[in-house]
Each structure stands twice: as structure tokens, then as C-alpha cells.
Amino acid sequence: MNSGGAGFSRRAFLGAGAAIGGLALLAPTRAGVARAAAPFEPTREVTLTAGEMELKLLGPDKPATRILAYDCTPFQTLRMPRGTRLKATFVNGIDEGSTLHFHGIRMPNEYDGVPTLTQPLVQPGSRFVHLLPLDDPGTFFFHPHCDETGQAGMGLAGVLIVEDTRDPAFDAEHVLCLKDWRLAPDGSFLPLTEPEGASKAGTFGATRTVNGAAALELKAPAGGHARLRILNIDSTRIMDIGVEGGDAWLIAVDGHALPPVRLDDLPDGIWRMGPAQRIDLDIRMPADGSPVTLGDYRAADIYHFATLTAEGRVSKPRKGPLALPKADLPQPDMKRAARLSFTLQQATGQAVKEIALPADDPLATALIDSLCVGATTYWGIQSESWPTGANRSVPPPLARMTTGTSYVVEIKNETRFPHPVHLHGHAFEVRASSLDRLPRHFADTVLVQPGEAVEIAFVAAPGDWVFHCHILEHMETGMMGWFRIV
């Protein structure tokens, strides 16, 4: 990879395909992690091969960029029915180690794609098989979970849509992947991380795209309802998604249905979404055929990324909104829930401590591959930081939990910057915000503003699950930990 940057100095000495002292051996077996009792019978099989391809991100008449993609398809979209038993084989066709993580999918822990913690790093030319029960309908995505700033920053991501036959029939549907790119005028990549960005809000790209284009013109019938699945797959940027020209309702967050919320009734008439977050919108097209525009309103220079224009007309307009079936998820027992609290911090000598796993822990002697750690620590959770630099030992879990127990977790942000916090392997209920800005909903990632405390609740599923900021530079420079659930 040629993504460069101060945060990942290992690129200076890692050659293509090189392994460091056998550190990418099989991840240790972990006691207490449940595996499926019944044989897994796949009903669908796919192979996803990571590789390079060219894409003209700067414009049709400008130089092309060598990006990363699965199966030479930018932001490849897979569609499968709810209930699918998916056998997904990841083939690493790039020149450094990688893994595949299916973001937001509730799955057996061994298929989560986190190197060292749940599986070995997949070396160039090697493969790894994931067995995934797709029981939750919605909009999900997949991406690497090592050197994410480099690999995802260069485009390595895809979309997984789990379809539900119970959904209402929309008159149109579109999938929109929002991503920025850090490009030089010749189409090459600028450094994807810089210390000034990694230690603050992140290193931003200036070339903004939706599905790899500057903007899109989409079609929907006049008077009809269009379902828009919007994914923020950027490494850094937080976006304020708004709609002009038509009625719009928020009908799902991170794939999970919620009672429709009119976008105009939310604070500032927008939905704020950080990296890795997804929303589904129901947009009712004007009966007179006038267009509807979608934009990111976070900056003064609004980025209008899509326009819905009328094509045809529905014969029997529906008032709407078109609600999705209620999410069928484990419901936390609030009367018996255990309570925990975690604080997001900027790392200083006083704020972050180094502690080790007990000597008898199966992961005590495991080392994280140098590819998967940053060079510098800037961030921490609860006075602990994920390893960086020469420290590559797996840290102790932030918490030990019990399978099947309900937990209420408070996430407090003591930093000056917002953080989209993601918990693997679970769908949690976002129950409360100290800023009183969020409707109650289920999600796998929640954006926590500076000075805010957000309360989430979930039923613990067995495994070793990471808990991290999804601004990728923040994660790779310390803001990641893990929960052990047995």
C-alpha cells in the first residue's frame, strides 16, 4: 500500500507479503467462547477477493487512481434474504495482510475478523472462511480490520443488504456509499494519516464522492416513495444528512427499524452520522414531479451528493411514511441489567496506563501484527489504550461480562472531538443522551459528541468483542478495547 503517513511507520520496513517473525500464526484458542452446536448448512456461498483496480475519482478527463476493492467492484453490493446462512470466503489479493469484518452482523465470535483476538491475519494469497447467520434484515457493510486507515482509506469496503419479505413495497430504492479520498492532482494517494489529523478530528480527504462519483442523479416516480440506504464508509468525516424538496422520514439506523421519524423534526432537520453508520430514509417524491436533493450540511459549503428526479408517476399515491417491521433483536432486561461506564479520553502520561493480561490467559503471549498497530498513542478508553509502536501485546479486556446478561453501558466523551463508537457482535439500544438529541433506536455504532454521555443497553453475546471509535485514525492510535463475555 502507498498510503503513507506518520501513524503507520511499519510501511517503511514491511515488504510486500513479508511476515514478521511468524507473528501471524493462529490466534490462541479462548476458553469460554461458544461455538454453534448445530452444523452450519450454507444456503449461499460467495468469494470476496481483495485487489487493486483503477477508478477515475477526479473526473472522467482526469488521471485514474489505483484503489482497493473486492472483486474489482467499487463498493460491491451483496443482497441476500433474511435467514440466509452465508459462507463467505475472503481471499487476500493485496500485497499485505488483511482480514474481512462484516460490520453490524451478529455472528459467532470466531468469524468477526479481528486479527489476533478472533483469528490470524490473512497473509497475501491466503484465504479465510466466514460462516454467518444473516438473521437481522437491514443495511450492513464489510471492510478490513487491520491497517484500516490504509486499506479502507483506499476504498476496500462493500455493502451487504439483508432483505426482508415483510418490508413494504417502495417505488424505488437506491444505495449510496459516501466516501472522501485524499488524492494528488495526478490521481495518486496523499498520506492517508498525518499526526495533526490523527491527534484531533482526523485527516480529511478533499475529493468527496458518492458511489465513486462526485454526485448522482437518481430516478423515482412522482408521488412515489423512494427508499435510500445511505452508508458513511469514510475513514474520518462526520456528516449531517438532510433532504430538500420532499418529505423524508428516518426508518432505520444501522440496518435496524425504528418508528419513522420525520427528518425535519430532528434537531436542525438533519441526521448526524459518523463513519460506519448507516441510515435508511423513506422519501416521498413531490406529486408535481419536482426534484429532491440530498446533502451533507455539516460545513458551510454544502455537499449535495444526490438528486432524485421524477421518472413516471405512481397511479395511487400513498401518504406515508412506509414503516419497516419492528427489529427482532434481543431486548435488554432493564430491571436486572448490570451497569458499566467507560470514558473516552485523549492520551496523556497521566490519563493512560499500561497493564497486562494475567500470565495464564490464552492471549497473554499473543502479539498483534505490526501491520495492525499505529506508531503513536493519542487516545484511550477508561485510561487504557490499544497498543501502538513497539508495544504489541494484547491488553486486558475493558470488562468481563456474562453471556445472556443485560448491560447498560454509559459512554462519556471527555475529549474535544466527537467519536462514533462501535461494539462488535451486538445490536444495542441507544436509550438516552445527556444532550437529549437522539430518538431511542437500535444500532451498532453511536456518535458521542464532546462532553456528551450516551447510554446504551444490550444482551451480552459470548466472545471477545472489540469496542472502538470508528474514526479509523483514532482507533489505530489507541481508542479501542475489548469485552470478554463468557
List the model feature ranges, each with a label.
Residues 70-71, 75-77, 109-139, 146-149, ...:
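Aromatic/His-enriched, Gly/Pro-containing loop or helix-boundary segments
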